[in-house]
Design a protein with these regions (language model features):
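Acidic/polar low-complexity segments with low predicted structural confidence
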Residues: 1-95
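Von Willebrand factor
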Residues: 75, 90-198, 203, 235-237, 244-248
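Glycine- and acidic
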Residues: 99-109, 160-167, 214
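Short secondary-structure boundary/capping segments
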Residues: 115-117, 149-154, 209-219, 259-264
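Short beta-strand-loop
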Residues: 135-161, 252-260
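VWA/integrin I-like adhesion module and closely mimicked acidic/polar interface patches used
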Residues: 202-259
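Conserved small/polar residues in nucleotide/adenosyl-binding loops
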Residues: 272-274
Length: 274
């Protein structure tokens, strides 16, 4: 795991300049549609806030048992409605924490600015509601899966600007990245743990120049990679983590996205629907 070349001790000037250029590019692209993005942030922020407020209220419903309501005692023997008690329903689901995981592989390059904006909108809305959230990108380099952290759970609102450092290169071993994030997310104290994965439904991590071996490590593509990712998603859900997908790929890859996330994914067709 790394914080990236700009925010860590890195002597590679070329890499710093490269990431800096991508950050400028993503920021400019966001600025072109800034009004739409700000509207989306406010809509999502307000929607989350309403949900949190509703969970603070307790509902009271008529019941045959529970707390006695004295002014309903007249019904006994006089009415068919003999419910003179009320039962309290507690809507409080507890605290929330969210991890946002972004596929940073080369196949996302054509949508790089849009994906960065999507992640930024999500992080802004969550942070404005005081919900701890972490944003990370992942891709593969040689034999390693790299997790780049743009913001941590308790980072400030300003830290969300780091998301525009997002750039796409290399391959993507989605299953391993999800597994790594889940291991840390499990240890959080919040009651509700949510993982949102922005990906194109194309897990792919081919090892070049290693002969014809077809082990999982060297043939991570197609149905094998999709199945591995789907297994990790299901394992996470079995451990009590809600996993949601945000599809950022081409329509032809939708079947793979459905196999991985089931019904729990969103397909965003335009900026208006972010």
């Amino acid at each position: 795991m790394t914080d990236g070349v700009i925010r860590s001790n890195c002597d590679n000037g070329f890499q710093k300049n490269l990431v800096g250029r991508h950050k400028v590019k993503n920021t400019l692209a966001y600025g072109v549609n800034k009004r739409i993005h700000k509207r989306n942030i406010h809509k999502l922020r307000d929607s989350i806030a309403r949900t949190l407020v509703q969970e603070e209220f307790k509902d009271e419903i008529p019941s045959d048992q529970g707390m006695l309501v004295p002014n309903k005692l007249w019904r006994v023997g006089r009415s068919s409605n003999t419910k003179v008690f009320v039962r309290t329903l507690d809507n409080d689901k507890g605290s929330y924490v969210v991890d946002i995981l972004i596929d940073s592989s080369g196949s996302q390059r054509r949508n790089q600015a849009l994906v960065a904006s999507q992640a930024y909108v999500l992080a802004q809305a969550l942070t404005l509601n005081g919900i701890p959230n972490r944003v990370m990108g992942f891709n593969s380099f040689l034999d390693y899966t790299i997790l780049k952290r743009y913001r941590d759970y308790e980072s400030s609102l300003r830290a969300n600007e780091n998301i525009f450092e997002y750039y796409c290169t290399g391959n993507n071993r989605d299953g391993l990245a999800i597994k790594a994030v889940v291991e840390e997310l499990k240890s959080r104290p919040e009651d509700n743990k949510i993982l949102i994965v922005l990906s194109d439904g194309r897990p792919n991590d081919i090892k070049v120049g290693k002969g014809q071996s077809q082990t999982l490590e060297e043939a991570y593509r197609g149905a094998t990679a999709v199945r591995d990712t789907a297994i990790e998603v299901r394992r996470a859900r079995q451990q009590g983590i809600m996993v949601l997908g945000v599809f950022t790929g081409k329509e032809r890859d939708l079947p793979a996205e459905k196999l991985i996330y089931g019904k729990d994914f969103a397909y965003i067709l335009s900026l208006i629907h972010i």
